[in-house]
Curated annotation (Swiss-Prot):
It comes from the Eukaryota. GO terms for biological process: asparagine catabolic process via L-aspartate; proteolysis. Gene3D superfamilies: (Glycosyl)asparaginase. It comes from Drosophila melanogaster (Fruit fly). Has both L-asparaginase and beta-aspartyl peptidase activity. Does not have aspartylglucosaminidase activity and is inactive toward GlcNAc-L-Asn. Likewise, has no activity toward glutamine. This is Probable isoaspartyl peptidase/L-asparaginase CG7860. Keywords: Autocatalytic cleavage, Hydrolase, Protease.
Amino acid sequence: MPRPVLLIHGGAGDISDSRIAGKFAGIKQALRSAWGLLSPDNGSGGGSALDAVEAAVRSMELDENFNAGYGSCLNTSGQVELEASLMEGRDLRAGCITLLRDVMHPITVARRLMEKQRHTFLGGAAAQELALATGSERLQPGALVTEGARLTLKEFEDQVAQGKDPFFARTELTDDKPVPKTDPSGETVGAVAMDASGQIVVGTSTGGITGKWPGRIGDTPILGSGTYADNCRGGVSTTGHGETLMRYNLAQRILSAMEYQGLSAQAAADKECREMTKRLGGTGGAIVVGHSGDLGISFTSRRMAWGYVQDGTIFYGIEGQVVHQEPFTLST
């Protein structure tokens, strides 16, 4: 019987020092929210990878330390447009949502699409209609916007006015500003889980990139770029500069390296993240769970928040090879 695994990320990008504590707190809370659904205390092994992934992503969608749900980045019109995808590896079912507004949990809308509808991908008005018809609350316009997101949009606009390309000048954003929540390259949240039955599920959710045009669609809802799950190979959730991830098809390339080159989850993630940045210039990262339960965590961005639980210990990090660990409990 496979050992349950839950690996999550809170986005890759130019994350300032002042935001690290919030990222770590959010990662730990998301793991606490989800782990009990994946590995029940009764030891029955009957936990659900699908429930755990949704719960972990929902937790981060509620947390303004992440670019998903509440606190998502803003487009050029100052609005939040959300995207999410969810995929399960047994039957390759998936639900993909884009251009969703004024709904807190796009990952749940993606699950409802996957489980109850005949389509795989909905956007705009159709996604909005599905969300409201299946129980999502319609929030007041602007309810998902935070002061941090407004400040980051202003910083983006200032860089554009100075003739800079803010989508690639990631280290230009300063560390001494108190809030800016996300750099223009775009952070994302994601989770990959495998339960005791061997079922692999991946979920990814984002607000996109600061300063995007209204109607822009990124990598997160695109299968093979932002999300992919296949019980025969593994599961991948990616994060970073969306246009780069789409062009490179990062998630699928990582799984292909595992399948056809015999690489481990870690080696495949390292190889493809490096090759993507070398060829295209944009940065990003990925978390990977192989079909045997091995883990991969890799990024070419300055930082990427991540965490997982193993043998009663939580492991987490945000930069380089630095790994923090502490005893894991479900209570705060």
